[in-house]
Every structure is written in C-alpha cells, then in structure tokens.
Amino acid sequence: MKWIFCIPLFFILNCFAQDVNKLNKAGEKQGSWTGYYENSYSKRYQGYFDNGKPTGRFTYYALEGHINSIVDFINDSISDVQMFHDNGTIMAEGKYLNKLKTGKWFIYSRNDYLLNIFTYHKGALEGTQYTYHPKFDDYEKLKVMEQYECKGGLKHGLWKEFNKLGRVKSEGYFVDGAKEGVFTYYFANGSIEMKGPFEKDVKNGDWFFYNGETSNMDKLTYVNGEVYVPKDDK
C-alpha cells in the first residue's frame, strides 16, 4: 500500500520540477525560475522570465534565508525596488531606469524610521539631498540633520547642517565635491562659534573663533591648511 501512494507523489513532484527552470529553443530562461547560491541549497531568487528577460516580481534572498530585496520589473527599462534589513523592515526603496537609480530613494533604519531622501539622475546624486536625525520612538519628530545640493554625484552648492532643535549648526558652499568659500559654524544657541574660508577643501585665509559669551574673538591665519606663524614668532 505504501508503494501505491508513492507513485502519485513522485508524479506530482516530477511535474512540478518540469514547470520551473526551463529554457526556450534559443537557450534563454523561460517561465518560473528559482536560482540558488553556488554550491548551496540556499535559494537566491525566485521570478519569471519571458524569453530571457525578467518580468513581474522577483524576490531575492540572503544566503541566511531572509528576503534581501523585491524587484518589480515594470518593463524593459523601469523597475521598482525594495531592499530589506535582516529583521524584515525596509532598508531602502526607489526606482531604476535602464539599470541606474533614478528619482527619489528613501533610506530607513532597522527601526523603520526615515534616515535619508536621496534624489538620483542616471545613477548619480542630483539636486537637493536630505539626511535626518535618527529617531528611536514614534513620539520624536522627524528633523533634518543635513541638507545639501548635488551635481553629477558630487556636493555642489549650498550645504547646511542642523542640530536637533532645528537650528543651523554649520553652513557653507561646495564646488565639485570640495568646500569652497566661507564656512560658518554655530553654537547651540545660534551664535557664531567660528568661521573662515576654504579653498578646494583646504583652510586658507583668516579664521575667527568666538567664545560664545562675549564679542571677543581669536584669529588664526591658515596657509594650505596649516596655521601660519610669522617668522618673528618662531
């Protein structure tokens, strides 16, 4: 009797196996596919191919077994992506165009709180970018920690850093990824702590330092990133 029940079970499993991981006459992947890590029984992905092209939803797995990412292939050029932390919460979500990141991408902490909003064009950061102070519970308000402009993947334009009270902590300008011009740094109460110029990411010129309590200030002159000391003072 046991042998009688084994026959249909084998038949079912065999039929199922024939419905996945098939190739068309051109040798291209066709239909449902399940991929595995090399030299392993651990699943790497599940999805559907149409004449070698991924179509619809693909689920990708980490070697440890949890879901790494979910990709929805909208057409030949556009796909929506969700990436996951190992605890199952979303780590990042956004869109690809021609296999390059495009538009807004949202980055989240393991606790499911927003950390960044990045904007891409043809795979490079472009436009206004945001980084947020980490949140640890639902009662905290989401507050910007850093805001800056990008061009071609590099910081280019106004850059600002904020404290948790929402006040500007520091600000200045970047040109092609390097600090350029006067940068100003503030105490928590909003008064100036120090300010001075950069040239191609290096301190150059007179820097002023304030104690935050009086109008007194100290001045240091920098040359190529080094404090300038007159010969008479050496």
Give the residues covered by each predicted segment.
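Glycine/tyrosine- and acidic-biased, solvent-exposed loop/turn segments at the edges of beta-strands
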Residues: C15-K234
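Bacterial Sec-dependent N-terminal signal peptides
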Residues: M1-N21
